[in-house]
């Protein structure tokens, strides 16, 4: 035992000595890495040995990394006294500030960077440095807070001035714009030819083959010395008659101011040589003799001429003379213009269809067509108008030659004397009164006249045009509202004030099945019943009568009823059986109430109906009163309102015999 303890103590001392002899390279407390693997061996002597791989604390491993040196310590269980010492030593180690474990490797321990960075203060410092770096980076993007508002304004002004320096000068821009405008004006002026004074002359090459013929320059004078009309007859052409028409009698010195004019050659002149003599056509002659259109000068023109030539008084006098001259020339032109062509003369022509008047132009299509062709071009020349009018008058004066056809046989034309639609009887009478058919002279065949150009007939009168005021058909007569409409039978109002035969039969069936019931229980007195003679139950003698006698008796009874109706009608006492009645011909109010309640009408309505038909005032109704009451119930069910009084036509509809006779048709 002593030998074992001595060996263990020697090993422990050697380990502590080795730890104490090595210098401390780091200020931080070291940790001892203890391997979790423990080899527990039981000696044959009964002692437990704990062998573990341990590394020296803060020891520098100088061996190569492939085979690190790991001293093995064998733990030997000692007695209780030794174990107490070991526990105390472990407590001292645990209470010491150095930790038991260390995360750094021996290589990391040798490097100063790892040792310095592993400190908490260094870590906190590095975090602060990173935060400060980020804060300065974000502040660099913003404007400096040290700048004053005045400094900022100066910087903005400098930036604006720097930008304006790059913009080109406004004067240069204006010069450039003026240059472009002047170029446009020059191009316009080069294309326009004007004369404004005596000194301004136009020099043009007359020998060039230009489509425009200009007036000679020696004849261009001041435009305000005299008045000259503008002889333009269209918006594209201007033809001075003094140059184009050498035969005109217009004096050049008396025409007034002259303006340069442009003559546009027609396609005909461009195709043919004008210098070569040729025969002018009518169209060319008419185009050359076109009358001028006068254009008077304005007051501004006269004012300009006054400023250049003379005083203001001379200008005013000159202006008044010009106005007078212009008005005079206008009046002369109006007189020179040809008048409208008169209508052709109407000549009577005979035809089978009736007498009417027609002009010669309609019968001679060639002449009318030629006149239209010649008159299609409007001209102001007086000679042309007179010649044309004279030619038309000569055409009208000449006799018209109609084509001749062989005469037709009378046998083939005898059917043509019949009266036609729209022909008066006088024309037919004249043809028949002349004698035989051979005496009647038929007119020569003429050229048919179209319906569009034919004049209206003389005997036909213009009818007055009457416009429709509505789209409805006025020919249809207005139907009576009370008349029966087959298409709408539900809108028939003809039987509203009378009881129809079908309804009467239906009501009589209800009456026959309920009359005279429950009178055995009646205690009150009923009007018209003779209680002294046995309650009016008289036995009637049944007598066989012939049908003729029965019909005569019924007709006599009806006449008596009508006479009584004339005196009082349905309001009489006999009609309501007030003076004379039979129990079998009455119906009690309790029965009537049960029948009428089946209609499900309100009790107030049924009470009003009872008051309208109750003439007996004893709680009973006779046959006419019951039938009228049933009809009023049906009318209320149909939706009609009750009247204050039952119409007389309803009571009169019940006075008939009630016999319907059917007539058989003939075989």
Curated annotation (Swiss-Prot):
Residues 81-91, 133-144, 276-289, 325-335 have a biased composition (Basic and acidic residues). Residues 1-123, 133-152, 234-441, 459-488 are annotated as: Disordered. Residues 1-10, 18-33, 46-61, 92-109, 234-248, 376-394, 424-437 have a biased composition (Polar residues). Residues 568-661 form the EH domain. Keywords: Lipid metabolism. It comes from the Eukaryota. SMART domains: EH (SM00027). Pfam families: EH (PF12763). InterPro entries: EF-hand-dom_pair, EH_dom. One of its GO terms (biological process) is lipid metabolic process. The keyword Magnesium does not apply. Residues 110-121, 298-312, 358-371 have a biased composition (Low complexity). Belongs to the IRS4 family. Positive regulator of phosphatidylinositol 4,5-bisphosphate turnover and negatively regulates signaling through the cell integrity pathway. Involved in rDNA silencing. This is Increased rDNA silencing protein 4. It comes from Meyerozyma guilliermondii (strain ATCC 6260 / CBS 566 / DSM 6381 / JCM 1539 / NBRC 10279 / NRRL Y-324). The gene is IRS4.
């Amino acid at each position: 035992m002593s030998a074992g303890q001595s060996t263990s103590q020697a090993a422990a001392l050697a380990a502590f000595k080795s730890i104490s002899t090595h210098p401390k390279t780091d200020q931080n407390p070291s940790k001892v890495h203890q391997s979790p693997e423990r080899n527990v061996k039981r000696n044959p002597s009964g002692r437990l040995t704990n062998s573990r791989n341990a590394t020296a604390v803060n020891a520098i491993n100088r061996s190569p990394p492939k085979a690190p040196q790991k001293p093995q310590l064998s733990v030997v269980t000692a007695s209780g006294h030794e174990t107490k010492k070991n526990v105390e030593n472990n407590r001292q180690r645990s209470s010491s500030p150095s930790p038991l474990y260390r995360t750094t490797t021996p290589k990391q321990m040798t490097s100063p960077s790892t040792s310095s960075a592993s400190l908490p203060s260094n870590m906190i410092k590095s975090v602060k440095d990173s935060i400060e770096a980020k804060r300065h980076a974000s502040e660099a993007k913003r404007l400096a807070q040290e700048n004053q508002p005045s400094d900022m304004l100066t910087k903005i002004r400098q930036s604006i001035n720097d930008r304006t320096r790059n913009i080109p000068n406004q004067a240069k821009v204006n010069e450039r714009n003026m240059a472009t405008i002047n170029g446009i004006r020059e191009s316009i002026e080069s294309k326009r030819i004007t004369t404004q004074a005596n000194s301004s002359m136009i020099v043009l090459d007359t020998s060039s083959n230009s489509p425009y013929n200009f007036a000679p320059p020696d004849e261009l004078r001041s435009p305000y010395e005299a008045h000259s009309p503008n002889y333009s007859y269209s918006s594209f052409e201007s033809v001075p008659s003094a140059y184009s028409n050498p035969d005109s009698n217009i004096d050049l010195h008396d025409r007034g101011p002259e303006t340069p004019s442009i003559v546009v050659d027609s396609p005909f002149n461009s195709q043919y040589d004008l210098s070569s003599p040729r025969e002018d056509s009518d169209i060319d002659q008419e185009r050359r003799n076109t009358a001028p259109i006068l254009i008077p000068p304005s007051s501004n023109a006269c004012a300009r001429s006054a400023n250049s030539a003379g005083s203001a008084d001379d200008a005013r006098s000159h202006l008044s003379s010009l106005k007078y001259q212009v008005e005079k020339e206008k009046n002369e032109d109006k007189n020179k213009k040809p008048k409208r062509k008169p209508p052709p003369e109407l000549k009577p022509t005979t035809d089978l269809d009736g007498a009417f008047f027609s002009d010669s132009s309609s019968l001679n299509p060639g002449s009318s067509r030629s006149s239209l062709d010649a008159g299609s071009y409007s001209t102001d020349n007086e000679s042309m108008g007179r010649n044309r009018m004279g030619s038309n008058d000569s055409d009208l004066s000449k006799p018209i030659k109609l084509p001749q056809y062989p005469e037709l046989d009378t046998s083939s034309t005898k059917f043509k004397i019949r009266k036609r639609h729209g022909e008066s009887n006088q024309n037919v009478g004249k043809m028949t009164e002349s004698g035989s058919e051979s005496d009647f002279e038929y007119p020569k065949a003429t050229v048919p006249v179209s319906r569009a150009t034919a004049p209206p007939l003389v005997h036909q009168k213009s009818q007055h045009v009457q416009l429709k005021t509505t789209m409805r058909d006025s020919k249809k007569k207005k139907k009576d509202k009370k008349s029966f409409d087959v298409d709408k039978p539900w809108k028939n109002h003809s039987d509203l004030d009378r009881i129809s035969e079908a309804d009467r039969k239906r009501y009589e069936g209800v009456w026959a099945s309920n009359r005279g019931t429950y009178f055995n229980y009646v205690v009150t007195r009923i009007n018209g019943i003779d209680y002294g003679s046995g309650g009016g139950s008289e036995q009637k003698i049944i007598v066989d009568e012939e049908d003729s006698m029965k019909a005569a008796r019924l007709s006599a009874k009806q006449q008596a009823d009508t006479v009584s109706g004339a005196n009082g009608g349905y309001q009489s006492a006999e009609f309501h059986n007030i003076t004379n009645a039979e129990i079998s011909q009455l119906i009690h109010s309790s029965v009537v109430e049960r029948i009428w309640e089946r209609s499900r009408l309100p009790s107030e309505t049924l009470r009003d109906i009872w008051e309208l038909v109750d003439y007996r005032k004893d709680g009973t109704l006779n046959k006419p009163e019951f039938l009228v009451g049933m009809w009023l119930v049906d009318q209320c069910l149909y939706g009609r309102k009750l009247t204050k009084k039952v119409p007389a036509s309803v009571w009169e509809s019940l006075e008939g015999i009630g016999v319907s006779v059917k007539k058989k048709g003939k075989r």
